[in-house]
Amino acid sequence: TGSQELSVRIHEFGGGVSQLIGTGGRDLSEKIGGLMMLDAIDMLEADDATRVIALISKPPAPAVAEKVLARARVCRKPVVVCFLGSNEPPADEDGLQFARGTKEAALKAVLLTGIKKDDLDLHPLNWPLIEEVRARLTPQQKYIRGLFCGGTLCDEAMFAALEKFDDVYSNIQPDPARRLKDISVSQAHTFLDFGDDDFTNGKPHPMIDPTNRISRLLQEARDPQVGVIVMDFVLGFGAHDDPVGVMIEAIKEAQAIAKADNRPLEILGYVLGTDQDPQSLAQQCQLLTDAGVIWASSSTNTGLLAREFVCKGERA
């Protein structure tokens, strides 16, 4: 989903994708050493249709990140690098630019092809909406629960939360101290990747079968400390024919659970797709709107909105 998110944002910004190579989530681990990404840079450098190369990865092993960056520095084409979960990205260099998140990476890539920034809708954060949500939530509703199909989407939202909160946990957190001890029980701010082996061993992927996510949505809705539940909905071939529609009844039930307990509950959705996907992007977003779900315009904004909704004692 990292490469899909990057390609969708490039499409939205008016750019195009000559080649998209999925390296796999473990490629930049110490064990594999970035073999696929290094090969991909070689191939794309030799490809006449490719003018700019963008690299995206879940948190890489530091030694492997250095190896990939060393290769990128000698590439004859401009390279944009987005290694999620890194601390402050390094300063841009000649021919090598760094991005903190997927939206910034897509923007830097399209600007390098000559597209003008002034011509683009950058979808800035909706601060009046953030103020509204903060005013609705009770003082004890201070936690985010992220229920994701896409691993990189989960990572990006989780790292946005980590910039402001210390008590952030996940089943895919590389730091053992922040990894959930029991994936069936959330603690504080919890971000779950339902596509990870923890949940898919012997079961269909959540992009196809929403069963696991539905039961967890209802579980999280019963927690009075939860202010916002975040979910992604991935479009494309091989995904569910109606990824939002299949969750609507569960969303309504979650809202009813909170209402019966006399408290609000914000559900934040993000539909990853384009107007050219087999499922209708506009229709999927409309289903969310009709169900009273706030929807975000990008993976980056999803993480930022969720984080800001539950910030206490701050003014937007």
Model-derived features: positions:
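Catalytic-core regions of core metabolic enzymes
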Residues: 1-316
